[in-house]
Every structure is written in structure tokens, then in C-alpha cells.
Amino acid sequence: IPMTIFGPDDLTLIKEGPSNRRTYIDELLIRTHPKHLKQRTDLESVLKQRNAFLKQQKGYLSNENQNTLTVWSEQFATLSKQWGTVRQETLGEIQDLAQQAYENLVGGTEKLEIIYDPQWLHEGLLPLLKEAEKDEVRRGTTLIGPHRDDIEIYLDGMPARTHASQGEQRTIALSLRVAG
């Protein structure tokens, strides 16, 4: 019997930062499309290795290490584009389900929107990584990509995190659980 569990921690989907929403959509994506698990694992591996390389530079990137960073950046950009695309597709699949669940729960006509539209997915990640390279080397971490994205949730055009009441936030979180 399929079952949906809803608990107090589910409010973090709405109230807390973007990492909770990324985790929710990524877990949903892998649960509904298990074929993408390897893609996610590959992305995490390349990100981990790229970050380790950036940390090793200790704030300075020599010319000889520039080529290595370029290779990591190219791999990361390719895998990120694939992951960002399947994230968008998955959110497209659950948008209507979440809206319907919300309407069924409240009996109203408020519009629930789930938006994932990272700038890098349209412009290409590689040029943005190149632009952020000095800062990334200085900080020793990757600053742009799917690991930093947010999935925004709106109720009637207003950010649910800041403008929805606590009851509305609970209903939105429940709608997302039911949709997934």
C-alpha cells in the first residue's frame, strides 16, 4: 500500500533554506526515475573532486593547474546541465499534481507554483564557472551549479516562505508530499 508520511520536518521544505528543497526534488526524481541515480552519483563525485582540487590550490592557481581545473569544470558543467534538465522535467511532472492536491485540501483557487529556473542552465555553466574561477580558487569550493540552486515555491504569485501563513505553509508542504 503506497503511503505518504507527513511530519513536522516537512515544513522545512517551505520555511528553511534551499538545501531542503533540493533534497526533496532530488529524492523524488530518483524515486520516480531510478535510471538517473548514476547521473546524480557521477555529478556528486565530480563536484567532490573539483572541490578537493580547488582546496588544494590554497588560493592560488598555477598555469599548469589551470588545465586540470578546466577539465573538472567541463565535466561538472556537462553533468550539471543533464541534472538541471531532469530536475526541471520532474518539477514539471509534479506541478499539476501539487496544485491539484492543494486545491483538494483547501477547496480554494489559490495558485501554487514550483519554479526551478537557474540562470546557468540557460546561459551555460562553463562561462559562469570561468567568471567565478578566481573566487572559487580563493574560497576552495564550487560556487555555482545545481548544488547551490533553489526551488522557489509561490502561492498566488508571492513567495510562500515569507508570505504564506503557517497553515498555508503546512498545506503546501503536504501538497508536495502527496504530489511526490
Q: Model-predicted segments: where are they?
A:
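Short, flexible active-site-proximal loops enriched in glycine and acidic residues
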Residues: 38, 42, 56-66
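General structural signal for alpha-helix termini and helix-helix connectors
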Residues: 27-34, 52, 56-60, 78, ...
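Extended, charged alpha-helical "arm/stalk" segments used for dimerization and assembly
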Residues: 1-53
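Conserved NTPase motor "head" modules and their coupling/switch loops across ABC/AAA+ ATPases, GTPases
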Residues: 60-180
